[in-house]
Amino acid sequence: MSEGHIAAISKTNKRKNRRKKRRTQDVSDSSSDSSSDSENSSVEDNDTKLETVEKAASDVEDVTLSDIDMDKEEDEAALDDKKASRKEGSVLSSETVDKLNKVGLTTSDLTGNNGIHLGNIDLNKMSATLDESSNKLLENNKDKNGLKNQYLSMLFESYGDDMNELRNAPDFTSKTLVMLANVLKDGGDMFDLETLKTIVEDK
């Protein structure tokens, strides 16, 4: 039997014993001494069986736990061996270093040749590229903010009656209105820029 089966059996036996004990107490009050003696002996038999099952379960549990402990110790020893071998292999040979130095790096418009040489980088070209990228980013943010505002106005048009009902609520304040507007506006973030444009244009 597995450990789970033994535990399940012992739990059901405990429940049965509790039920039987309660019944024997109820019955012993109303029945004769001879019948209560026979019931008590059956309860004692069940207690003995229960103790035997519990003892067997604890033996199985001890064996299982000791197996697990041994497995953990073996795993820890294997990890220590791996760490030691990594430390030994972390020193690169001179041949490996030479091969790595000969590997050519990718070229770009900014470097103009293989590898990165700070003296060869055209800083003006890099500056222009960065400025262009930041301008595009600003335009996209402006577009997105404008689209979010249009999305918010579309929501207020569609759900204006519901918004008016919210305003009439006793706990509605000016802070609540601002928070609600910001939440609805930020709801546009769940769409990418093109989808948001499509939604706003289709209104």
UniProtKB/Swiss-Prot annotation:
Keywords: Nucleus, Ribonucleoprotein, Ribosome biogenesis. InterPro entries: Ribosome_Assembly_3 (IPR051898), Rsa3_C (IPR028217). Its main location: nucleus. It holds the Pfam family Rsa3. Residues 1-90 are annotated as: Disordered. Residues 12-23 have a biased composition (Basic residues). Residues 46-58, 79-89 have a biased composition (Basic and acidic residues). Required for efficient biogenesis of the 60S ribosomal subunit. Belongs to the RSA3 family. PANTHER family: RIBOSOME ASSEMBLY PROTEIN 3 (PTHR28127:SF1). This is Ribosome assembly protein 3.
